[in-house]
Amino acid sequence: MLGRARKGYCAAVTRRIIGLLRASHFGPNLLVTILSYFFAQLYWWEGPAFVIAVGVFCGQLVVGWSNDLIDYKDDLLHNRQVKPLVSGEISVPLLQNCLRVILPIAILINLFGPLGFIGGGLSVFAIGWAVAYNFYFKFTIFSWLPFAVAFGSLPSCMALSKGQMPTLWMWLGGALVGTAAHFLNVIKDMEQDKASGIKGLPQRFGSKASLVSAFVLIATAVALLLLTFESLPSATP
């Protein structure tokens, strides 16, 4: 009897952990975290780079969890069972409590970690922009702006942590990739978003134009990276 209860408890905890990871939009979260580790290694050795990546991961948890909480009613309306809150894998109070815990952790790691107050401040600034998308920008023609700012800040905060001025390719390349990610992310729910009154730039463009825009933006970002490849920094202790 005790063994069954223990197994049931472990299964419930595991289900909640998986639900929390899914609510963070784990795929994109992991991708951004890996990219941050890559950029951090251009300036730092592996130890500090790992801490920087952890800070970015925590920031992505803030963004993803706040997004699912804000979108909960709309997700219910459209019966999006892929969302853990709608499927019942996790509850709203649980996600709210986790968000309250992770927010100060994300701020502290970014500000007091290897990024320092300047680089870490930019990272926290980017988190703020990403959360602002959930509250306001997603409904406007400037829905792309938080993505451009957040992705543009990702490599730039690494340079600032070493007292270096971020180069143009960091800001522009990151902004292009971020805007492309926004267009691609919206396509799958575009019609439901329109029905809910969400009128960001991709919704105004439509699916086909958004897909073409994303391709052009990514191609431009890749071309920019290739043109500036020799200017990539090398890690220093």
Predicted regions: what they are:
Residues 2-237:
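Multi-pass alpha-helical membrane architecture of UbiA-family
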